[in-house]
Amino acid sequence: AHGFKAVASKTKVPSRKDTMVGTVYNQIDKKAYAYISKWNSLEDATFLSDILQANLRVRFSEEDFSIEGNFYAKGTLIILRGDNKTTLEFDKQVTSIANKNSRILNPVQTGFVSSGKDFGSSSVRPINKQKVAVISGKGTSSLSFGEIWHFFDTQLQYPLTAIDTEYFNRVDLHTYDVLIIPNGYYSSILNKKGLEKISEFSKGGGTVIAIGSALRSFADKDGFELKIKKTSASDKEKNNTNLMAYAAKERARANTAITGAIFKSKLDDTHPLAFGYENSYFSLKLNNASYAYLNNGSNVAYFDKSATNIAGFAGQEALKNIPESLLFGEERKGNGSIIYMVDNPLFRSFWDNGKLFFVNAIF
């Protein structure tokens, strides 16, 4: 759940000392060309949230780079003095926010790197202060909505607007930058007209984040790349199930179910959605929903042909449909995009290792 690297031991490992976590205190450097902060944890995301809400301008690097003897991975935050010329007490604000969030800043004296792309290049892109909305109300899973609201309110500490399904059709989505669609069933609003509205919002530069069962509203619909993966069961097998004795049907249903299992996925760690991660991710799968790889889009996280559950229960028939399927993907539409999240990265707010995917999707 937390994404920690670990080792197993069959014997007791003695500890010789207690390790104390020190207090982070960043010094002001008025000669700094920029302040650099790494990107690989939820604490980094909270730091970014505070920076944006202080109206400070911040960028991120799309590529790995090295500068002044230090290596930084793609996704690293770069706060340039030149971007914040009108900010009063720039150094004090940046260091104070970093100290509050226990983030280590590395001040650098130049924007010219020893490897990678210089800070003035198009690969060092600005992060916008996004205006975010989430769908709520009838058809929305109250649990999924609650997970999202809790995440914004208590962890990311970033503003979020709820749009009820009762008046969704009357809302001008172009007043927002990001629209989150939680788990739910949206046939009442995401009909042909509603999907056209979503599509126009995305083409105009908006980001749509669809989670879990919300993906059904987009799958196999005209104008969208998402496709349901064809099941492995044959018509003959389905007919045999219909003729099965009542007492055997419960076992048969279990054979096609996933009630909570962990699967290891592959990642395209060059895609911004996966910044802060390595080349794999352990996902918690709560049902047997399966979607095909995107033909015209980015398959950022996916299950390869060898994918299987490494913990938890998954029926044998359900397992047949997970390999070579999508986990997280992006479909570009005009100036914006639709992010498909097959599994919920915020499940009950305890699956901490998935939360950075969600933040990457927002910003």
Give names to the regions the model predicted.
Residues 1-363:
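Intrinsic-disorder/low-complexity accessory segments
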